[in-house]
Amino acid sequence: HGVSEYGMRYAPFAEFMTEHGFAVVANDHLGHGLSAEKDADTLYFGPRDGWMHVVDDMYALRCRTKEKYPDVPYFLMGHSMGSFLTRTYLIRYPGTVDAAIIMGTGHQSPAVVAGGRAIAGAAGKRHGFDAHSPRVENLAFGAYNKAFAPNRTEVDWLSVSENNVDAYIADPLCGQKASIGLFYEMLGGIRFVSAQKNINSMNLNTPILFIAGDKDPVGEMGK
């Protein structure tokens, strides 16, 4: 799942898949949904190597699922931030899934990633990595809604369905402020998955399906 949401937000999709013969499992990433610290002010992966801990959690879920369904193929699907986590997973745990679906992913130049991470790092040292920074959040997400002006809400970019947008806004487990540390870790993850030496560590025999929305700003409108 993406930033500021959680696994059960996709329950209708899971129900559709189970009706068609699939078993569906999902976790709430660190700091999100039921994995968040009670009364936490921000979404926070933790003080050190949080991105990789999230990926390790994904592998732990895979292992538990395979124990219950040992003879069933395991497909890993990641959306938005989850797409970058899935790409990281495929590098760190090659050959442990039968196929992957990468949805709503993107690419940023090394210079942009380095610049953003430097800004987030400086802000974290000044305010604390578990704090929220409007400036850092604006650098990450500020441009997304501009393509949908005039805006009805601050998150019109999330979905072409107004009902989906309104449900997101009304959900108490969605829309929380992301910490500086989360953005710092996520940019580190994006840098990791973009490095050719890391890409070379993937199992090239694993089938991968890429899905991109033609109005999704994360993937530059489907580009």
Q: Where is each model-derived feature located?
A:
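Conserved alpha/beta-hydrolase
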Residues: 9-40
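Alpha/beta-hydrolase active-site loop
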Residues: 45-67
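Short beta-strand/loop motif that positions the catalytic acidic residue
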Residues: 210-212
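Alpha/beta-hydrolase fold nucleophile elbow
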Residues: 69-80
